[in-house]
Amino acid sequence: MDLQLLYFTSIFSIFIFMFMTHKIVTKKSNSTPSLPPGPWKLPIIGNMHNLVGSPLPHHRLRDLSAKYGSLMHLKLGEVSTIVVSSPEYAKEVMKTHDHIFASRPYVLAAEIMDYDFKGVAFTPYGDYWRQLRKIFALELLSSKRVQSFQPIREEVLTSFIKRMATIEGSQVNVTKEVISTVFTITARTALGSKSRHHQKLISVVTEAAKISGGFDLGDLYPSVKFLQHMSGLKPKLEKLHQQADQIMQNIINEHREAKSSATGDQGEEEVLLDVLLKKEFGLSDESIKAVIWDIFGGGSDTSSATITWAMAEMIKNPRTMEKVQTEVRRVFDKEGRPNGSGTENLKYLKSVVSETLRLHPPAPLLLPRECGQACEINGYHIPAKSRVIVNAWAIGRDPRLWTEAERFYPERFIERSIEYKSNSFEFIPFGAGRRMCPGLTFGLSNVEYVLAMLMYHFDWKLPKGTKNEDLGMTEIFGITVARKDDLYLIPKTVHN
């Protein structure tokens, strides 16, 4: 009898224990906010199958968000990923909770090429980032500093225009010419006078950009280190890094020697390398090289892609090109010659650049952010260490936000006052908040001035047999999203 009583007592105790445990777990589960909605996850790969077969991830993510919501959860390999596709949620990430989402996730290419995250773009949020950001804002790329580079821009653009004039009436690869010109401007403003090293560095930057775009398996499975080698990306990046490091170190050494010797160019304008070498900043050579790499990578591809997209859109919309040419020629003729300060009066040209960036942001998914600590957004749980992707391209083409969203219509930026640095999160081609692109002023100055010179000096048309409306606008995805096909046009000189 005692054994039977003990048996039933034990069974009853186990039942009570299991019942209470279930209630506690259920209560805890109900009190914890759920993750944002998203497609069904498969074991091991998560949602990677949802992106397979799409060469343009920003398009595929827009389509998935239309089904699951503008705050969407994906599991890409091992990485918990939050996709933001509306200005309301973009504001939550880049303003309301900006301090939580101010860091960057692990990216293999940034670790290798950026000297273990020593550049401003991918360095973790903290004191070192604050130091770099302050140097960028107050010294490196301030409005005053960017204006001081105007003589360099004018010199480079004058050579470019003369070269175009000599081949008037012939077919020109505008894409190639613009890339070369913008890289040259960047090299001269960052490193100083023409150097035998400039073209070598440009070649390495271009090659690194080609192989670093898109999602890499090593980034999606950070705990499985051998995948970095299996994909072949790591050894390729390490080889390019060695080349870039040697080139940039030679440039730094030669710059130091030139400045310390009597043969140095005493009359030259201070360039970005001069600023970085100032002793009061206390930057190591590795930090300086990482920043130079960021300036080349972030300031050249993006600007040249934007210029080429703008030219293509104006060719498809001749009325827009005519309005830009009329404005540019009126303003510059009044001032006697083309100059950088005159671009401030080119309101319509600026609206063309804004409309180009709305439809074709060079980094459509911006740079990824990382959630520093678990938080809630609109009742949804965002786990710590989640990678956050903001689809600026989808926001810029959302028909709920923009009338005739797919139409190229620069006048919308004259009719509505929307600025790059405003609190309007429906237009964020440069990001927003703490991690907003620090090179915004530098990049826009280059884009606006190059376009102004192209519109002032030349009329442009497509090669014979190609109609404006048939011009292809297909994208190719990479670190920067550019036109898939090079743009070929025929210039006709208007102003020598």
Swiss-Prot record:
Keywords: Heme, Iron, Metal-binding, Monooxygenase, Oxidoreductase. Its cofactor is heme. The keyword Zinc-finger does not apply. Induction: By fungal elicitor. It comes from the Eukaryota. GO terms for molecular function: heme binding; iron ion binding; monooxygenase activity; oxidoreductase activity, acting on paired donors, with incorporation or reduction of molecular oxygen. Heme binds at residue 437. Belongs to the cytochrome P450 family. This is Cytochrome P450 71D9. It comes from Glycine max (Soybean). The gene is CYP71D9.
